[in-house]
From Swiss-Prot:
Protein name per the record: Adenosylcobinamide-GDP ribazoletransferase
Record has Metal-binding as a keyword: no
Organism per entry: Brucella canis (strain ATCC 23365 / NCTC 10854 / RM-666)
Keywords from the UniProt entry: Cell inner membrane, Cell membrane, Cobalamin biosynthesis, Magnesium, Membrane, Transferase, Transmembrane, Transmembrane helix
Listed PANTHER family: ADENOSYLCOBINAMIDE-GDP RIBAZOLETRANSFERASE (PTHR34148:SF1)
Lineage of the organism: Bacteria, Pseudomonadati, Pseudomonadota, Alphaproteobacteria, Hyphomicrobiales
Cofactor: Mg(2+)
Entry GO MF terms: adenosylcobinamide-GDP ribazoletransferase activity; cobalamin 5'-phosphate synthase activity
Cellular component annotations (GO), alphabetically ordered: plasma membrane
Pathway annotation: Cofactor biosynthesis; adenosylcobalamin biosynthesis; adenosylcobalamin from cob(II)yrinate a,c-diamide: step 7/7
GO biological process: cobalamin biosynthetic process
Record's keyword annotation contains Cell membrane: yes
Amino acid sequence: MQRNGLIGDTIRSLGFLSRLPLPQGWFDNTDDSLPRNARAFPLAGGILGLLAGVALLIANAISLPPLAAALIAIGALAAMTGALHEDGLGDTADGFFGASTPDRRLDIMKDSRIGTFAALTLVIWTGVKASLLMAIIARAGAGYALLALIGTEAASRAGMLAFWHALPSARPGGLADSMGQPQWETVVCGCGLGLALLAIGFLPSGGMVALINALVLMTVVLFGFARLCMAKIGGQTGDTLGAAQQIGSLAALIGLVMAL
């Protein structure tokens, strides 16, 4: 089997983006460059969304209320990823709004302690995402909420990939900078995969309106976030990549709920 093909890239992307147990053989003697494997980030995100959706379906099947089912799905995503992207969102909120200079913002973002801005952002973000999933369950059904999670988690990682490519590193010599950036061909492939999975996730319940809503909202908010990153720290870091994924996922869900 081609370990450097799309399947191998997907497994290695899961290895980076999640804590799922994966066969070690897929990581041996391969071109494991993260910027190259990143074309499969949307596929890895779709798998994570599927697993979180299954948790939501189980919660719904045993008659738990929609809020509980939504929170279980969100918790499952955080558990599978080690809250990788949520950590980035929180650190970004602390850094961007807790300091007045780029260097100080970057220092705060490296600090593992959680601050007021991070706590507030994560609480509000979790509440909004849970309410959106509840709305999908109520208006379309739990099965469509599962599909929405697949599409959202895939498309948001495609958006993260484009964001990573578009912005320079804000911290030369840092971890994100040392990994390099994905090439244009990688971004095009990843965005194509993300769009396909977003269509699979959103068209059955919300039709073309939901798909267009999601694409427009994701584009607008990620462009705005990119401008904010340039103004605050002069580029991107690993934390802002995680924040971009979280922001993109929320924008996509809002687009779907608007169409239901």
